[in-house]
Protein backbone atom coordinates (compact mmCIF):
# COMPACT_ATOMS: atom_id res chain seq x y z
CA UNK A 1 0.00 0.00 0.00
CA UNK A 2 1.31 3.39 -0.97
CA UNK A 3 0.92 5.80 1.88
CA UNK A 4 2.42 8.70 3.74
CA UNK A 5 2.10 9.77 7.35
CA UNK A 6 0.47 12.85 8.84
CA UNK A 7 1.74 13.62 12.33
CA UNK A 8 0.57 15.87 15.12
CA UNK A 9 2.88 16.98 17.93
CA UNK A 10 2.24 18.27 21.61
CA UNK A 11 6.54 37.41 -2.24
CA UNK A 12 5.51 40.24 -3.98
CA UNK A 13 3.16 43.19 -3.28
CA UNK A 14 -0.30 42.54 -1.86
CA UNK A 15 -1.76 42.59 -5.34
CA UNK A 16 0.06 39.33 -6.04
CA UNK A 17 -0.96 37.63 -2.81
CA UNK A 18 -3.24 34.57 -2.89
CA UNK A 19 -5.67 36.35 -0.54
CA UNK A 20 -7.17 39.50 -2.11
CA UNK A 21 -7.54 42.65 -0.07
CA UNK A 22 -10.87 42.83 1.70
CA UNK A 23 -11.52 39.09 1.52
CA UNK A 24 -12.83 37.19 4.53
CA UNK A 25 -11.68 33.91 6.00
CA UNK A 26 -11.95 31.78 9.12
CA UNK A 27 -8.17 31.58 9.43
CA UNK A 28 -5.32 33.44 7.74
CA UNK A 29 -2.25 31.25 7.25
CA UNK A 30 1.18 32.82 6.99
CA UNK A 31 3.32 30.74 4.64
CA UNK A 32 7.10 30.60 4.96
CA UNK A 33 8.95 28.63 2.30
CA UNK A 34 12.20 27.06 3.50
CA UNK A 35 14.69 26.04 0.84
CA UNK A 36 13.49 26.36 -2.75
CA UNK A 37 11.13 29.33 -3.19
CA UNK A 38 8.25 29.38 -5.66
CA UNK A 39 6.14 32.52 -6.09
CA UNK A 40 3.34 30.54 -7.74
CA UNK A 41 3.15 27.76 -5.15
CA UNK A 42 1.19 29.66 -2.50
CA UNK A 43 -1.22 31.01 -5.11
CA UNK A 44 -1.83 27.50 -6.42
CA UNK A 45 -2.15 26.13 -2.89
CA UNK A 46 -4.84 28.72 -2.13
CA UNK A 47 -6.82 27.60 -5.18
CA UNK A 48 -6.44 23.90 -4.36
CA UNK A 49 -7.47 24.32 -0.71
CA UNK A 50 -10.47 26.43 -1.73
CA UNK A 51 -11.60 23.70 -4.14
CA UNK A 52 -11.39 21.04 -1.43
CA UNK A 53 -13.34 23.17 1.04
CA UNK A 54 -15.95 24.30 -1.49
CA UNK A 55 -19.40 23.93 0.01
CA UNK A 56 -18.10 23.29 3.54
CA UNK A 57 -18.69 26.79 4.84
CA UNK A 58 -15.01 26.98 5.81
CA UNK A 59 -12.58 29.46 4.27
CA UNK A 60 -8.80 29.37 4.73
CA UNK A 61 -6.69 32.20 3.32
CA UNK A 62 -2.95 32.23 2.66
CA UNK A 63 -0.33 34.97 2.57
CA UNK A 64 3.12 34.42 1.07
CA UNK A 65 5.45 35.89 3.70
CA UNK A 66 8.46 36.25 1.39
CA UNK A 67 9.53 39.87 1.79
CA UNK A 68 6.29 40.88 3.53
CA UNK A 69 6.74 43.24 6.53
CA UNK A 70 3.26 42.30 7.74
CA UNK A 71 4.61 38.84 8.58
CA UNK A 72 6.99 40.39 11.11
CA UNK A 73 4.03 41.44 13.25
CA UNK A 74 2.74 39.32 16.10
CA UNK A 75 0.18 36.64 15.29
CA UNK A 76 -3.48 37.42 15.79
CA UNK A 77 -5.97 34.92 17.19
CA UNK A 78 -7.19 34.07 13.71
CA UNK A 79 -3.73 33.37 12.23
CA UNK A 80 -1.71 30.19 11.79
CA UNK A 81 1.79 29.53 10.47
CA UNK A 82 2.72 27.08 7.70
CA UNK A 83 6.30 26.14 6.92
CA UNK A 84 6.77 24.61 3.47
CA UNK A 85 10.06 22.72 3.72
CA UNK A 86 11.82 21.72 0.50
CA UNK A 87 13.23 18.40 1.68
CA UNK A 88 12.11 15.41 3.71
CA UNK A 89 11.32 15.12 7.39
CA UNK A 90 14.71 14.74 9.16
CA UNK A 91 13.94 11.37 10.76
CA UNK A 92 11.00 9.87 8.82
CA UNK A 93 10.79 10.25 5.06
CA UNK A 94 7.15 9.08 5.07
CA UNK A 95 6.03 12.01 7.22
CA UNK A 96 4.61 14.66 4.90
CA UNK A 97 3.05 16.92 7.51
CA UNK A 98 3.32 17.79 11.19
CA UNK A 99 1.27 20.03 13.45
CA UNK A 100 2.68 21.31 16.70
CA UNK A 101 -0.65 21.25 18.42
CA UNK A 102 -1.48 22.70 21.80
CA UNK A 103 -4.44 22.03 24.07
CA UNK A 104 -8.14 22.88 23.76
CA UNK A 105 -7.58 25.94 25.94
CA UNK A 106 -4.38 26.99 24.18
CA UNK A 107 -4.29 25.73 20.60
CA UNK A 108 -1.09 25.52 18.59
CA UNK A 109 -0.35 27.67 15.56
CA UNK A 110 2.58 26.03 13.72
CA UNK A 111 2.53 23.30 11.09
CA UNK A 112 5.22 22.00 8.76
CA UNK A 113 4.70 20.29 5.41
CA UNK A 114 7.59 18.56 3.64
CA UNK A 115 7.62 19.09 -0.10
CA UNK A 116 10.20 16.33 -0.56
CA UNK A 117 7.73 13.81 0.83
CA UNK A 118 5.02 15.10 -1.50
CA UNK A 119 7.39 14.81 -4.47
CA UNK A 120 8.35 11.27 -3.47
CA UNK A 121 4.68 10.30 -3.15
CA UNK A 122 3.89 11.93 -6.50
CA UNK A 123 6.58 9.90 -8.26
CA UNK A 124 5.23 6.69 -6.76
CA UNK A 125 1.68 7.55 -7.81
CA UNK A 126 2.80 8.39 -11.34
CA UNK A 127 4.55 5.03 -11.52
CA UNK A 128 1.34 3.25 -10.57
CA UNK A 129 -0.64 5.20 -13.16
CA UNK A 130 1.90 4.60 -15.93
CA UNK A 131 1.93 0.88 -15.15
CA UNK A 132 -1.86 0.94 -15.48
CA UNK A 133 -2.40 -0.43 -11.98
CA UNK A 134 -4.07 2.84 -11.00
CA UNK A 135 -6.16 5.51 -12.70
CA UNK A 136 -4.42 8.01 -14.95
CA UNK A 137 -6.09 10.76 -12.90
CA UNK A 138 -3.01 10.45 -10.69
CA UNK A 139 -0.93 11.89 -13.53
CA UNK A 140 -2.93 15.11 -13.36
CA UNK A 141 -2.27 15.88 -9.68
CA UNK A 142 -0.06 18.93 -9.20
CA UNK A 143 2.13 19.65 -6.20
CA UNK A 144 -0.44 22.14 -4.92
CA UNK A 145 -3.23 19.57 -5.36
CA UNK A 146 -1.31 17.15 -3.14
CA UNK A 147 -0.28 19.76 -0.60
CA UNK A 148 -3.87 20.91 -0.08
CA UNK A 149 -5.30 17.90 1.83
CA UNK A 150 -2.12 17.68 3.91
CA UNK A 151 -2.39 21.33 4.93
CA UNK A 152 -6.10 20.99 5.74
CA UNK A 153 -5.33 17.88 7.80
CA UNK A 154 -2.74 19.74 9.86
CA UNK A 155 -5.08 22.70 10.34
CA UNK A 156 -7.58 20.30 11.91
CA UNK A 157 -4.87 19.07 14.30
CA UNK A 158 -4.21 22.66 15.35
CA UNK A 159 -7.83 23.69 15.79
CA UNK A 160 -9.16 20.42 17.26
CA UNK A 161 -6.13 19.05 19.16
CA UNK A 162 -8.03 16.20 20.81
CA UNK A 163 -9.79 14.99 17.65
CA UNK A 164 -9.27 11.31 16.76
CA UNK A 165 -8.53 10.52 13.11
CA UNK A 166 -11.49 9.65 10.92
CA UNK A 167 -12.43 9.51 7.25
CA UNK A 168 -11.52 11.34 4.05
CA UNK A 169 -8.90 14.04 4.45
CA UNK A 170 -8.91 13.31 8.17
CA UNK A 171 -7.50 9.79 7.80
CA UNK A 172 -4.16 9.20 9.51
CA UNK A 173 -2.78 7.72 6.28
CA UNK A 174 -3.75 8.46 2.68
CA UNK A 175 -3.29 5.56 0.26
CA UNK A 176 -3.38 5.42 -3.55
CA UNK A 177 -7.17 5.01 -3.49
CA UNK A 178 -7.48 8.27 -1.60
CA UNK A 179 -5.26 10.15 -4.05
CA UNK A 180 -7.48 8.87 -6.86
CA UNK A 181 -10.49 10.21 -4.97
CA UNK A 182 -8.68 13.52 -4.66
CA UNK A 183 -8.10 13.59 -8.41
CA UNK A 184 -11.78 12.84 -9.00
CA UNK A 185 -12.92 15.58 -6.60
CA UNK A 186 -14.24 13.07 -4.06
CA UNK A 187 -11.84 13.48 -1.12
CA UNK A 188 -13.43 15.75 1.48
CA UNK A 189 -13.75 16.45 5.19
CA UNK A 190 -16.58 14.57 6.87
CA UNK A 191 -19.77 16.46 7.73
CA UNK A 192 -19.41 15.96 11.50
CA UNK A 193 -15.82 17.17 11.51
CA UNK A 194 -16.75 20.15 9.37
CA UNK A 195 -19.45 21.08 11.88
CA UNK A 196 -16.97 20.94 14.76
CA UNK A 197 -14.56 23.16 12.85
CA UNK A 198 -17.31 25.68 12.13
CA UNK A 199 -18.09 25.72 15.85
CA UNK A 200 -14.49 26.72 16.53
CA UNK A 201 -14.69 29.52 13.97
CA UNK A 202 -18.02 30.78 15.30
CA UNK A 203 -16.28 31.87 18.50
CA UNK A 204 -15.01 34.93 16.64
CA UNK A 205 -16.02 36.99 13.62
CA UNK A 206 -14.32 36.24 10.29
CA UNK A 207 -11.10 38.14 9.65
CA UNK A 208 -10.99 40.96 7.11
CA UNK A 209 -7.60 41.14 5.40
CA UNK A 210 -6.94 44.79 4.76
CA UNK A 211 -3.78 46.73 4.22
CA UNK A 212 -2.36 48.09 7.45
CA UNK A 213 -4.53 45.78 9.55
Task: Tell what function each PLM region has.
Residues 1-13:
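Bacterial N-terminal signal peptides
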Residues 22-37, 130-132:
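Acidic/histidine-rich, surface-exposed loop or edge segments in extracytoplasmic proteins
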Residues 25, 58, 166:
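Residue-level signal for beta-strand positions within conserved beta-sheet cores that form or flank
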Residues 39-155, 161:
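Metzincin-family zinc-dependent endopeptidase catalytic domain
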Amino acid sequence: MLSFVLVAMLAGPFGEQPTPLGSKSDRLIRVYQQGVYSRELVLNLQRAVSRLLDGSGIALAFIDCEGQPICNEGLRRDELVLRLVSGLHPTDSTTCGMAFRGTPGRPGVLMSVYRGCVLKTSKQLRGLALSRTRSTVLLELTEADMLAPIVIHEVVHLLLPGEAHGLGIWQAVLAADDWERLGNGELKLGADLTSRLRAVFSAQAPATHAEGR
